[in-house]
Amino acid sequence: MATQPPQDQTSTTPSLPPHLDPTTYPRILTSATHNIHLELTYSTLNPTVALEHTSSPAAGANVLFLGTTRDTFEGRAVSQLSYTSYPPLALKSLMSIATRAVEKFDLKGVYIAHRLGVVPISEASIVVAVSAGHRGMAWKAAEEVLEEVKEKVEIWKREEFVDGGMEWRENRERDAEGRILSSTEGGK
């Protein structure tokens, strides 16, 4: 009777579902009609690329927002953040937000990229860039886009603390000034 060769340990390891496998990223969705570029990625975010996507000869204003990982949360030392998502839903939600913003604020371009996986202290987890004919519309649009992304998009955050603790959080638990929102004011 022949003996079976030992199995390679890697072949018995269950594979990750595609939406959790970093090798299947970046996931990108675009709209040439509205100059929209949306991206979910495990790579470091590049604000220069964001501005390249949104710049337009018709734009007199470009607004760029970078959300970065802080080193503390409510007095606890943070070691890093981790993000996860379900890309088909997240990209659909991002496109809806970006398209509404283009129409509402007459934007010339929108770029939204969100990082997934581990995001160390001081690194960006989200970049939002918009361009418009004038600065007032660009400022308002960028803030509204960011708030809607945090409130509506299927992306979840795990805060990992230096003391070894960790907590999963919705992106939308605080307002733009850092105040805690009640469950009736916002959130998923």
From Swiss-Prot:
It is an enzyme of class 2 (transferase). Residues 1-23 are annotated as: Disordered. One of its GO terms (cellular component) is cytosol. Substrate binds at H134, R135, K150, K157, R158, E159. It catalyses: 2 [molybdopterin-synthase sulfur-carrier protein]-C-terminal-Gly-aminoethanethioate + cyclic pyranopterin phosphate + H2O = molybdopterin + 2 [molybdopterin-synthase sulfur-carrier protein]-C-terminal Gly-Gly + 2 H(+). CDD domains: MoaE (cd00756). One of its GO terms (biological process) is Mo-molybdopterin cofactor biosynthetic process. Residues 1-14 have a biased composition (Low complexity). One of its GO terms (molecular function) is molybdopterin synthase activity. Pathway: Cofactor biosynthesis; molybdopterin biosynthesis. The keyword Phosphoprotein does not apply. Keywords: Cytoplasm, Molybdenum cofactor biosynthesis, Transferase. SUPFAM superfamilies: Molybdopterin synthase subunit MoaE. Heterotetramer; composed of 2 small (MOCS2A) and 2 large (MOCS2B) subunits. Belongs to the MoaE family. MOCS2B subfamily. Catalytic subunit of the molybdopterin synthase complex, a complex that catalyzes the conversion of precursor Z into molybdopterin. Acts by mediating the incorporation of 2 sulfur atoms from thiocarboxylated MOCS2A into precursor Z to generate a dithiolene group. This is Molybdopterin synthase catalytic subunit. It comes from Aspergillus fumigatus (strain ATCC MYA-4609 / CBS 101355 / FGSC A1100 / Af293).
